[in-house]
From Swiss-Prot:
InterPro entries: ATP_synth_asu-like_sf, ATP_synth_asu_C, ATP_synth_asu_C_sf, ATP_synth_F1_a_nt-bd_dom, ATP_synth_F1_asu, ATPase_a/bsu_AS, ATPase_F1/V1/A1_a/bsu_N, ATPase_F1/V1/A1_a/bsu_N_sf. Its EC number is 7.1.2.2. It is found in: Plastid, Chloroplast thylakoid membrane. The keyword Amino-acid biosynthesis does not apply. ATP binds at residues 170-177. The record marks 363 as: Required for activity. It is an enzyme of class 7 (translocase). Keywords: ATP synthesis, ATP-binding, CF(1), Chloroplast, Hydrogen ion transport, Ion transport, Membrane, Nucleotide-binding, Plastid, Thylakoid, Translocase, Transport. Produces ATP from ADP in the presence of a proton gradient across the membrane. The alpha chain is a regulatory subunit. This is ATP synthase subunit alpha, chloroplastic. It comes from Ceratophyllum demersum (Rigid hornwort).
């Protein structure tokens, strides 16, 4: 017969009582009143914070944007087709954040930092808030290092520095994305991490950009954040902030980063759609009143860190699309006032075969020559003024029948200068090659050539310099100055190549 030992039983009961841990969990919940068009109205959620993530019964995540007296307006991060009226919603107590790590390099992700390239999960041990405050005044220092784009027109006349915000603005189909992607291609070997954010674009266009990066070996140092035209407005609105959070992760690790937002017009449209559906009062062009803040808080995150923070940098190249060259529309004027300069691309120049179609007259960099190496300052100092004068003279010359010799010479020089600024897509030039090219044009060595021969001659000259005068590139890259020795080598190479070229053309 089994004997029951009272002391043993009491010990077991005591142990169980000691182990018992009652967890009290307060969950902030609400009920769906209505849902549709990517917006849900929720009754309840009394303790919810602005910008807090909420989770619906069937798993969809949303962001609480409108906190009203009778309900909460939530924007959905999915299609929300399975959400039903009356279903429950709970507040998560978190605001939007994404995982970050070095493993993101070379990957294509969406606005929630989930991979969409079919290459498996991305490991990350750390996370960053999608919206984080921009560095303060003390945390910054002025821009002084150049960020080379590989495009002669930009690096010589509208230079961009590390930590600058430079707007690329123009009509559709004027080569805005091409300027941005060429800049990424030119960062190879420069120790710059690039983030390309595609907002509301065609999936085929994004695929084309990714293919170009892969073929040119640029994906090794690039992250692509893509929310295509069929994505919800919420995700298109979030994509630039996700890209900025990834770039910041590297910036605060004392690295240099370049981020491209392609394009902010589409983000503003997505935000307008969300705001109107949430019944926020519309302002100019039906955009909400805080659309300026939408872009300013994003672009202010680009900075050049102070020496105390390790001198990392985040350079932003936002793209904005204009309608028939109207730079005075709402979004273009907003972004122009936030950025440190703009590169204006003209449809007329593009159609005239001048590519990149940069209108040098109204493009400007507010950092200026602080973001150029000394060699570039030496050769490109007067070229912007010369080109502006040439454009004015060219317009006048259309009406004048007989021009004096000096004017004819100035026109001929201007035409050759404009010709040397032309570049094929995905063919960025090293800064040493740019210095040689501009020096050749600015010092009249191209005057003896026909306009149609200029491009061919310059290609041959750059090859000649690379193979026969490698010391020239070494001097420029080590001293960053066009020294007397470098100039002598360059003059020699130009004379040799000019004689050879003219001989070839005669035969």
């Amino acid at each position: 017969m089994v004997t029951i030992r009272a002391d043993e039983i009491s010990n077991i009961i005591r142990e169980r009582i000691e182990q018992y841990n009652r967890e009290i969990k307060i969950v902030n919940t609400g009920t769906v009143l209505q849902v549709g068009d990517g917006i849900a109205r929720i009754h309840g959620l009394d303790e919810v914070m602005a910008g807090e993530l909420v989770e619906f019964e069937e798993g969809t995540i949303g962001i609480a944007l409108n906190l009203e007296s009778s309900n909460v307006g939530v924007v959905l991060m999915g299609d929300g087709l399975m959400i039903q009226e009356g279903s429950s919603v709970k507040a998560t107590g978190r605001i939007a954040q994404i995982p970050v790590s070095e493993s993101y390099l070379g990957r294509v992700i969406n606005a929630l930092a989930k991979p969409i390239d079919g290459r498996g999960e991305i490991s990350a041990s750390e996370s960053r808030l999608i919206e984080s405050p921009a560095p303060g005044i003390i945390s910054r220092r002025s821009v002084y290092e150049p960020l080379q784009t590989g495009l002669i027109a930009i690096d010589s006349m509208i230079p961009i520095g590390r930590g600058q915000r430079e707007l690329i603005i123009g009509d559709r189909q004027t080569g805005k994305t091409a300027v941005a992607t060429d800049t990424i291609l030119n960062q190879k070997g420069q120790n710059v991490i690039c983030v390309y954010v595609a907002i509301g674009q065609k999936a085929s266009s994004v695929a084309q950009v990714v293919t170009t990066f892969q073929e040119r070996g640029a994906m090794e140092y690039t992250i692509v954040v893509a929310e295509t035209a069929d994505s919800s407005a919420t995700l298109q609105y979030l994509a630039p902030y996700t890209g900025a959070a990834l770039a910041e992760y590297f910036m605060y690790r004392e690295r240099h980063t370049l981020i491209i937002y392609d394009d902010l017009s589409k983000q503003a449209q997505a935000y307008r759609q969300m705001s109107l559906l949430l019944r926020r009062p519309p302002g100019r062009e039906a955009y909400p009143g805080d659309v300026f803040y939408l872009h300013s808080r994003l672009l202010e995150r680009a900075a050049k860190s102070s020496s105390r923070l390790g001198e990392g940098s985040m350079t932003a190249l936002p793209i904005v699309e204009t309608q028939s060259g109207d730079v005075s529309a709402y979004i273009p004027t907003n972004v122009i006032s936030i950025t440190d300069g703009q590169i204006f691309l003209s449809a007329d120049l593009f159609n005239a075969g001048i590519r990149p179609a940069i209108n040098v007259g109204i493009s400007v960099s507010r950092v200026g020559s602080a973001a150029q190496i000394k060699a570039m300052k030496q050769v490109a100092g007067k070229s912007k003024l010369e080109l502006a004068q040439f454009a004015e003279l060219e317009a006048f010359a259309q009406f004048a029948s007989d021009l004096d010799k000096a004017t004819q010479n100035q026109l001929a020089r201007g035409q050759r200068l404009r010709e040397l600024l032309k570049q094929s897509q995905a063919a960025p030039l090293r800064v040493e090659e740019q210095v040689a090219t501009i020096y050749t044009g600015a010092n009249g060595y191209l005057d003896s050539l026909e306009i149609g021969q200029v491009k061919k001659f310059l290609v041959q000259l750059r090859t000649h310099l690379k193979t026969n005068k490698p010391q020239f590139q070494e001097i420029i890259s080590s001293t960053k100055t066009l020294t007397g020795d470098a100039e002598a080598l360059l003059k020699e190479a130009i004379q040799e190549q000019l004689e050879l070229f003219l001989l070839q053309e005669q035969t």
